[in-house]
UniProtKB/Swiss-Prot annotation:
One of its GO terms (molecular function) is structural constituent of ribosome. Coiled coil: none annotated. Keywords: Ribonucleoprotein, Ribosomal protein, RNA-binding, rRNA-binding. One of its GO terms (cellular component) is large ribosomal subunit. Pfam families: Ribosomal_L2, Ribosomal_L2_C. The keyword Chloroplast does not apply. It comes from Jannaschia sp. (strain CCS1). Gene3D superfamilies: 2.30.30.30, Nucleic acid-binding proteins, Ribosomal protein L2, domain 3. This is Large ribosomal subunit protein uL2. It comes from the Bacteria.
Length: 280
């Protein structure tokens, strides 16, 4: 999809750059593949804010997307490509030969009328899903499982992908777009191609109101607060905060590592995404 820029006939259109969605389905989603979505506003079960800067936004229906692709050896035809407000990527409605319908993540270069299939070994075409044991080395993939049968977890956002770079015993080596090189079991499923909507990161929403429609609230700087609210707060006049940048709870921010070094999956990471910063 291309980008649309606007002649600024109103202040909210100045600098506005949006995704051109003219080729997407303009109707409502399939009712049987949707469910209600309750807004949490960043609160947990006790009503306390656990995720700041969330709240409001337009009402949404959740589209049930098939991340597992477990309907093997049954061909499906793409009926339409749809917008999904719950993710940055587009989704494709597919109808299987037995009449069942499903939503899947739409990869780039997948069009209406195309055939897709999930199998132990299938053609290397966008939208086809198979385990790494059936993929040739060098393939660009998305929607990658970390555990067999759990459903895709890696490379699901707009424009993302990973490259299958090698085999190591019962594992497949994949290079992620972050630069990380990691192992996953060869039985894990992956879908051929890169995720649709690669221009998503080039959007400019133009005004604060459009961001509010997406359910995001303002991000207030600590130095603009009072001392009771933030370690950087207070002071006479404008101050720099007076210390290294910290979170509202006094922990170092801007670069501090938060991943547990003893995490079980650490041994599956061959090369860290931070390696390029360390000059390795």
């Amino acid at each position: 999809m291309a980008l649309k820029s606007y002649k600024p006939t109103t202040p909210g259109q100045r600098g506005l750059v949006l995704i051109d969605r003219s080729e997407l389905w303009k109707g409502r989603p399939v009712k049987s593949l949707t469910e209600g979505l309750t807004k949490k506003g960043g609160r947990n079960n006790t009503g306390r804010i656990t995720a700041r800067r969330r709240g409001g936004g337009a009402k949404r229906l959740y589209r049930i997307v098939d991340f597992k692709r477990t309907k093997f050896d049954v061909s499906a035809t793409v009926e339409r490509i749809e917008y999904d407000p719950n993710r940055t990527a587009f989704i494709a409605l597919v109808r299987y030969e037995d009449g069942e319908q499903n939503y899947i993540l739409a990869p780039q270069r997948l069009g209406v009328g195309d055939k897709v299939v999930a199998s132990k070994k299938a053609d290397i075409k966008p939208g086809n899903a198979m385990p790494f044991s059936g993929l040739p080395i060098g393939t660009i993939v998305h929607n990658i499982e970390l555990k067999p049968g759990k459903g895709g977890q890696i490379a699901r956002a707009a424009g993302t992908y990973a490259q299958f770079v090698g085999r190591d015993g019962g594992y497949a080596q994949i290079r992620l777009s972050s630069g990380e090189l990691r192992l996953v079991r060869q039985e894990c499923m992956a879908t051929v191609g890169a995720v649709s909507n690669p221009d998503n990161s080039n959007q400019n929403l133009g005004k604060a109101g459009r961001v509010r429609h997406m359910g995001k609230r303002p991000s207030v700087r600590g130095v603009a607060m009072n001392p009771i609210d933030h370690p950087h707060g207070g002071g006479e006049g404008r101050t720099s905060g007076g210390r290294t940048p910290v979170t509202p709870w006094g922990k170092d921010t801007k670069g501090r590592r938060t991943r547990d070094k003893n995490k079980a999956s650490q041994k599956l990471i061959i090369r860290s995404r931070h390696a390029k910063k360390k000059g390795r």
